[in-house]
Swiss-Prot record:
This is ATP phosphoribosyltransferase regulatory subunit. SUPFAM superfamilies: Class II aaRS and biotin synthetases. GO terms for molecular function: histidine-tRNA ligase activity. It comes from Rippkaea orientalis (strain PCC 8801 / RF-1). GO terms for biological process: histidyl-tRNA aminoacylation; L-histidine biosynthetic process. The gene is hisZ.
Amino acid sequence: MIHQPPAGARDLLPLEVVQKAWINDRLQQVFGGWGYQRIVTSTIEWLETLMAGGAIQHSTVIQLQDNSAGQLGLRPELTASIARAAVTRMADTTYPQRLCYRANVFRNPPSGHHGKQLEFYQAGVELLFAGGILADAEILLLVADCLEQLGIPQWQLLIGEAGVTRSLLSPFPDPLKSQVCHCLAQLDYVTLENLDYPSSHLKERAQLLFDLRGNATEVLEKVAKLELDKAGEESINNLKSLMRLINDSRSKPLPLTLDLSVIQTFDYYTGIVFKAVGKTDNQLHILGQGGRYDQLLGVYHPKGQSAPGIGFSFNVEDLYACLLNTSILPQLAPSIDWLIIPQTDEARSTAFQYAQNLRDSGKNLRVAIDLGGRSEAEIREYVQQNRVQQLAWIPEKGEPIIEVIFS
């Protein structure tokens, strides 16, 4: 039997680890530059916490065996866990709270997608207890700064507004509304067109919703011709103000598309929602996603008190895919600086001492000991394959013999 990871899981080998660590380190540097502090939450949570008051579907969560105190699950995203921690553990801190993270998340694939990836790596931020256009602008500009600092070659920001989209969907009866939402989220125009609509008016409205994407000014003109409730009209006005603020805050225009059909997988968003999209070899990648969630914190508050929040998460795998064919990522795993080779059994302790002296020199050296059992030819083959820079042959007595292989 050849042992492999289970379906939906995979191993990361040293070079890929180094490359993805490079991405994560750059993101953490940018997050820190904007005043965000890293938080680490538990991989395992109560199922009730993970479901975020019903905003996250039960079927999405990979559940663990029953615990005597309740059902447990692996986090499918970080926002709910961070919201829980902020409300229950950080109640006495000053506001707003700027928190960032990098972590793995786990999701059940949709029905019929056996073998699809179950574990994902994300990095992102949450700006908690902060509402209004300034907070929205900070998050969007931070997304842009991250993508520019990483050197992502082609990317675009798709921005929607959950309140406006809900207002536009309000005429649809509930079963049909869910189907339309699914088609919008999956960009599935064929299915959308063939749904069972009770009237031609609703079908035309669904088709119009699908097409509400493009230049911000043009999309807003289309929306102005539709009937919106008062909350929807207020959201549109806020969206206009946000677009102006973002454009005025940058030396060059943001690659931005207004897309009022944007619907996120998790249903706790209340304001702006967005996706960052990249392209490689005619394949689209969702680099990241996020939005405003002004009701989520109240789910975890002992008295149900709501507070504003907004955040986003980057999908590290998709960032990696967009950078893989560039020269930006490290192209080699770290090499060994020194290989220390005891020439006799009596020289082994001296070799360990010599290696430790090199490590203690403060030069952050990578020093390995040859563990014996190999001929000189085999050692030299290992040195070439692993790009060892220097050798130290340690005799029983006398000075080490130093060889510089790569410099």
